Amino acid sequence: MPVSFLSLASQPQIIDYPAIKEEIDSIKKVAAGDPVSEYRAVSLVLKQTVLKGREVIAEALTRRPHQGRIAALSYAYLTDQIIQLALYAMVGDDEKATDNLVILAVGGYGRGEMALHSDVDIAFLSRRSPRKAQKKLIESLISLLWDVGLRVSQSHRSLSDMVKMAKKDITIRTALLESRYLVGDKALFEEASTRFIQKVVAGSGRDFVAAKLLEWDERHLARGDSRYLVEPHLKEGKGGLRDLQSLFWIAKYLYLEKEARHTVLTSPILTDYALVKADLIAGHEAKRFRRCENFLWAVRCHLHILVKRPEERLNFDVQRSLAEKMGYRSKSGKSAVERFMHHYFLVTKMVGNLAALFIDALKVNHYLKPKSRRSGASKQIDGFPVIQGEIVLDDDFFFRHNPAALITLFAVAYRHRLDIHPLTLRQAGRDARLIDEALQNNPVCNAAFLTLFTLPYNPAPILKIMNNTGVLGRFIPDFGRIVAQMQFDMYHHYTVDEHAIRALDILWQIENNKLEDLYPLGSRLFKQLNARLVLYMALFLHDIAKGREGSHSALGAEIALRLCPRFGLTAAETKLVAWLVKNHLLMSHTAFQRDLADAKTITDFANAVKSPERLRLLYLLTVADISAVGPHIWNSWKNQLLTSLYEACSQCLLEGPTGHGAGRQQRIENRQNDVSEKLDWDNDLFHALVKRLPDDYWFSERTDVIAANMQQIIDTDSKGQSISVRGHEMPAYDATMISLYAIDHPGFFYRISGAIHATGGNILDARIHTTRDGMAMDNLLVQNSQGGMIKSGEHLNRMMQAIEDAATSHIRSSNKLAALRPPLFWRGKAFHVEPLVFIDNQASDRFTVIEVNAQDRPALLHDLGCALFNARLTISSAHIATYGERAVDVFYVSDLFSHKITNQNRLKAIEKRLLAAADAARISEK
């Protein structure tokens, strides 16, 4: 009869063991000694049984989509029955066939936890080397199990080998820790269990704990040391299933060591029971363990069913479908997928809290080197008992007697550079519910909280601890709404709360010159600040309205106006914080999506900023905000653009709008003098070329770029050539500058961009100039498809040749570009960005500014350029910004007579063309 470790009402529906057994008996009779036909018939029956059982489990999960634990156990139960039936098909009821042989379920399968495509880990154990017949039986059984659709992973060891290998190899020891009897010699299993505990487990608890916690740290490091990565690894990521399993392994190991009379046989599934019995967590915490486990297993089971393969990563392309499968719906400004992932991150946060409590208990129980809670002399600091530099509460009702201490605890630790004992944090988390509206408005509590931003220490670590305990979200309910909240896009790598705290950490490092190489201007500006508190508070609050309907910047400013007086900021400070929150995207949008060489860009930005102090604050907030989005988001190109905008705006604020305009000609002359010194040419030659270049050119390019362009023009003209393409590496931008000098003609830009895209390049920025005698002098900043510099060599040469071909012979790149389809599993496919076109005739005095928001894809810029060409427009400059799956391409354009486009019908026609180009897989060249 089957061994059952699970009580399921749907067991007969999953698999009818007696009926299948009878069918196998019938097959044997019909086969009448024909082993081939018998094998085929049995394997077919078992395969159909597996498929039917899996369908039943999937249907049950669809009806009750959050019953993950039941689904995981059901898959294990089905697998048990199939293995036992397969063995029965081979040996019948002959117990001698498995004499001296036992089959064990090990690993996750042994624990009774499986998803649809989980490996089936089994171990064959014998007292001594098996007989020839048993070896053949093992081989045949494994073959049959594979044929019926089980992904079997197996090992075969003798009893003595099992003990030796378990002592040496922590992975084998962990797998055996979860051994569960399936079928065979039960006496052998009991003996093996006893020897495993007495010879391997006994006396090795400390070593096992240390090894597992080392694995824990290494795993988190490998997967990204944050539980809030927006494409998390369900199994191996921080706060995922492996973390829960690690807690269980340690608990079970220590429990077995402590209660050596118990064997693996007598406790086939311990889970939260083991955690409690090992005195590692309390009963109510074990319930949280169970809830987390149930949810994560539900996600894993749905994921395996959805993708039809063993997949553990919650990629963007499955998150939306998972949310639908698990019954989430859009609500209150949050999409269904954002609500699902919010729940996911809350669960991983809970796992992190459980882990912290668990590790603390290990210290208390001396399985890790503990900081004694009671050793050493105690002293009082601001009402808190402190032992050896650590706040250690000796009263379990401390916070209930004094709820305000829930806030002052963290302020005292921060001010006096004290640690907080894990058990004290545990109490704070438990009692966080005591924080009510009265406590939120308590002046003492708010003054204490404000010290986290006024003292010169890094506020990020203490805020992270407050957040992990739940105190921060209770004290500031608006912040509580963004805890574990994700944004369903490819740009933001972390949840909103994690992003805010990371941004504060980066800001503090900039202030303290720890990142001077990355942020040279930021480090200098901090020394000039008068409103440090305002900056830190604005950064803390800048995304606090994320996830609400409406502009999160405007709504966040309203929240800042309400919260800052409560915290103790003055009216002037509050007003400035609110302005920064409302405008926290202004500088990045201006720098990345507007032409910084256009005088009106600078004057409009300066009019919005109004003062040098505001400019400094906004620059520093912008830098920290961008850098905290995720790894590699901040780069030298963004640094250069923001620095250029800062310097230009600073100059404009210094001179005033009138002075800024009046000094334009003087700045042109200064730039020309700088270039002249760099080139050291004959004056007549230099000034002859200067006359050919338009005034805007001198504002658009840096001195070294202008010098290189002028040398390129002279070299080309002197050789009587009509075209020149040069490329040089720009390490400061992590990109390559392509400079093109050729006869200008309509459609020049889109053909050139097509050639770049067709040869594996992405354009970051394009400066498009036409000399007074009709030559194009264009500078394009280009990266490879991986977002890096295209280094000198075959790739760069091939790209420059393609550009030359496109410029001289009007070669169209449509055929090559048509082949640039996104990869089959392109992450951007999970998103839909509705294309939008904004046309602005106020942003520039000379050009119409067109902004296109669209889903990023290969050759998008080429398609948009083609649409503008077909609309008979001339592009003066193009500015390209990407935010994950979303591209924002901005063009400064004029008509063929160098005038703005003002006719409303024509503007509507242009918008229609661009929307079609942005939304189409490919557009045709007319």
Swiss-Prot record:
Keywords: Hydrolase, Magnesium, Multifunctional enzyme, Nucleotidyltransferase, Repeat, Transferase. Its cofactor is Mg(2+). Pfam families: GlnD_UR_UTase, HD. It comes from the Bacteria. Coiled coil: none annotated. GO terms for biological process: regulation of nitrogen utilization. One of its GO terms (molecular function) is [protein-PII] uridylyltransferase activity. Belongs to the GlnD family. Modifies, by uridylylation and deuridylylation, the PII regulatory proteins (GlnB and homologs), in response to the nitrogen status of the cell that GlnD senses through the glutamine level. Under low glutamine levels, catalyzes the conversion of the PII proteins and UTP to PII-UMP and PPi, while under higher glutamine levels, GlnD hydrolyzes PII-UMP to PII and UMP (deuridylylation). Thus, controls uridylylation state and activity of the PII proteins, and plays an important role in the regulation of nitrogen assimilation and metabolism. Has four distinct domains: an N-terminal nucleotidyltransferase (NT) domain responsible for UTase activity, a central HD domain that encodes UR activity, and two C-terminal ACT domains that seem to have a role in glutamine sensing. This is Bifunctional uridylyltransferase/uridylyl-removing enzyme. The gene is glnD.
